[in-house]
C-alpha cells in the first residue's frame, strides 16, 4: 500500500540566471512495510528529495502526498502537525540535544504532542529496549559512542509510531559493523511495524537489501525499479 508519494517533484533555488535546479520531474512511491533507497553521487539531489518528501521543504513544482493529504498544500501549522505525528526522521549527524539524556532526547516528540507523562514513559522505554539502549537511558550524547547516538536517533524517530521513516545517510559516520546494526534495526522496524521507509545512502549493503531503488543524477531519475 502506498503511504507516501512524490509526483513530478521539482525544486529550484534562486531566480533568473543564478537559479539552480536541484530536482526536476521526480516520481517516487514509498510503500508500507517496504524499504525504498535513494542513491546517487553527492549533489545529485538525494537530500533535497528527502526534504520534500518529509515536509521539511516545499517543491517548486509537483506534489507530495502523505495518504490523502497533499503536503505541499498544507498550511505551516498543518504541515508541522504532519511532521510531528506522522513522519519520523533519522539524520546523519544524529541531531541530538547535548544537555538531555538519551531518554529525554527520545521523549522530545512526545512532549511536543503534549502526551501524558505515564504514556510518554512507556513509549520511551519501549523504543529504547527496541534499539538495545535501556541501560544507557540516563546518559547524555557525549557519553555515548557514534553507533549508540544513532540508535538514540532511530528511537526518537520511532517513538511517535510514525507512518513514514525518512533517513538521510544514517550510516554515513559509522564503522561497518555499527552501520550493519543500524541497517538491521531500520529493516526490522520497516518489516515488523509496517513502516514506509525511505533512505538516502551510498552504502552498497543497504542498497542491496532495499525493496526499491531510485537512482538520481543531477536532480533527475536515471534508474529505478519503482514500478
Question: What does each model-identified segment do?
Answer:
Residues 1-2, 226-227:
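Short, low-complexity, intrinsically disordered N-terminal peptides in bacterial proteins
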Residues 3-209, 213-216:
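ABC family nucleotide-binding domain
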Residues 213-226:
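H-loop (His-switch) and adjacent beta-strand-loop-beta switch element
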